Design a protein with these regions (language model features):
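Metal-dependent nuclease catalytic regions and adjoining charged, substrate-binding loops involved
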Residues: 1-13, 142-234
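Acidic/negatively charged segments and metal-coordination signatures
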Residues: 232-233, 237-245
Length: 269
């Protein structure tokens, strides 16, 4: 790997893809090879959007008293961190994504939250915590003109669990309660996790996971007569000689240097 590679990390990939399959995670982040996308049922997006509209500017005591005193300040905004580096490690990274909700607390600090639909799952707190820490880090260490907030002192998940329904004047109502699951804030541990991620990305490609459906699919198709073997060839950057990743732009797909934004080399596909 060329020295100085700068990886783009999304909060969702650090949470779900990293947790489910290291092989697919490295393929995505290092090589730009994504798992085939499967659209989520639209109802979840509808519920999330309705929640964000309803909670906008509301005081916490008016909808979930377990929350610290404050009000909903921001809903769904894009974030991007400054470049993250470690003194004893050549590779760097940055975080880019979109948070669900941020609350301004009465003590002058900020709370970063995420809406979930379904029963609360305390056993997944650590996994979801990566996503929330990624948002918090990016807000406190923003790049350029992206949103800057701090200090972030609280993180957590707001669960909506449907439990009952009724009909009133031809309007069908789905009812349920809200539950607050706080995530312990530990930015030092999160930065250590990011260094582990960079170590993984700079190392050899992990073996396919036995419990990953996409890894199993690739293995099965490679056994079909006439199937091509191995990963597609990754070109080298015409400007710096480093590896490239497949990216999507307004005019379609192209090869972009993985050292971006330090290098702007591109190739047509």
């Amino acid at each position: 790997m060329p020295e100085g590679t700068c990886y783009k990390l999304s909060p969702s990939e650090l949470t779900f893809l990293y947790n489910s399959c290291k092989h697919c995670f490295v393929l995505k982040v290092r090589h730009g090879i994504s798992q085939p996308s499967i659209p989520l049922p639209g109802i979840f997006s509808t519920i999330a959007n309705l929640q964000k509209d309803y909670f906008a500017d509301k005081r916490t005591e008016d909808f979930l008293p377990e929350l610290p005193s404050g009000k909903v300040e921001y809903g769904e905004k894009r974030i991007k961190s400054d470049v993250i580096s470690f003194s004893d490690f050549p590779a760097t990274c940055y975080i880019q994504g979109r948070f669900d909700v941020v609350l301004s607390l009465d003590d002058g600090t900020w709370l970063v939250g995420d809406f979930k639909t379904g029963r609360s799952a305390p056993e997944k707190t650590e996994m979801y915590g990566r996503q929330l820490h990624a948002y918090a880090y990016s807000l406190e260490n923003n790049a350029g003109d992206f949103l800057s907030l701090g200090p972030v002192t609280r993180l957590g998940l707001i669960y909506y669990t449907p439990a009952d329904c009724d009909m009133n004047e031809n309007i069908f109502n789905l009812k349920g309660g809200l539950e607050w699951n706080e995530v312990p804030l530990d930015m030092e541990n999160f930065q250590g996790f990011l260094k582990d991620v960079l170590t993984l990305l700079e190392g050899p490609l992990p073996n396919p996971s036995e419990d990953c459906n996409w890894c199993n699919f690739r293995a099965l198709t490679q056994n079909v007569e006439g199937a091509s073997k191995g990963l597609p060839e990754i070109p080298t950057c015409p400007d710096c000689g480093g590896a490239m990743a497949k990216r999507n732009g307004k005019n379609g797909s192209f090869w972009g240097c993985r050292a971006y934004p330090k290098c702007y080399g591109t190739l047509n596909i």
